[in-house]
Structure formats: structure tokens, C-alpha cells
From Swiss-Prot:
Pfam families: ThiS (PF02597). InterPro entries: Beta-grasp_dom_sf (IPR012675), Mopterin_synth/thiamin_S_b (IPR016155), Thi_S (IPR010035), ThiS/MoaD-like (IPR003749). It is found in: Plastid, Chloroplast. Disulfide bonds: none annotated. GO terms for cellular component: chloroplast. It comes from Pyropia yezoensis. Belongs to the ycf40 family. PANTHER family: SULFUR CARRIER PROTEIN THIS. Gene3D superfamilies: 3.10.20.30. Keywords: Chloroplast, Plastid. Coiled coil: none annotated. The gene is ycf40. This is Uncharacterized protein ycf40. Its main location: plastid.
């Protein structure tokens, strides 16, 4: 498998990583609980069921929103 570096944006901030990388792996690496986040990839809201099978590409834009319960 050939690895290459890609540049993506996470919540508007640049982030460099190796390709191939799945969305689930990246969320785990960044300590996000995938059951408590909403993720937009290039302006498309992704269901959690696609996190494992979605691989990131150069120049992708992610918005990760943490869902917090309260009362």
C-alpha cells in the first residue's frame, strides 16, 4: 500500500495526515467519540454508519461538532 501525505481542514484549521486514512481512524486519533459527534465532509452530513468506510482525500473539509447533553 502506498502512503502519501494529504492536507485537509478540520473545523477551518489545516491538518496534515497520511493517506489512506478513514474518517473513523481520524476521529479516534483526535479523541472524538464517534457516537457523540456530527460530521460534515465537504458540506455533506455523514451518518455514523459511514465513518469506517469513508476515506479522506487531499483538500477535504471536515466540520466536527460535538454533541453535549445537558439539563
Amino acid at each position: 500500500m502506498i502512503h502519501s501525505n494529504i492536507s485537509i481542514q478540520i473545523n477551518g484549521e489545516p491538518f496534515n495526515c497520511s493517506k489512506p486514512i478513514s474518517l473513523q481512524f481520524l476521529l479516534n486519533y483526535l479523541d472524538f467519540n464517534s457516537e457523540r459527534v456530527a460530521v460534515e465532509l465537504n458540506d455533506i452530513l455523514l451518518p455514523e454508519t459511514l465513518f469506517h468506510s469513508t476515506y479522506l482525500n487531499d483538500q477535504d473539509k471536515l466540520e466536527v461538532i460535538t454533541i453535549v447533553g445537558g439539563g
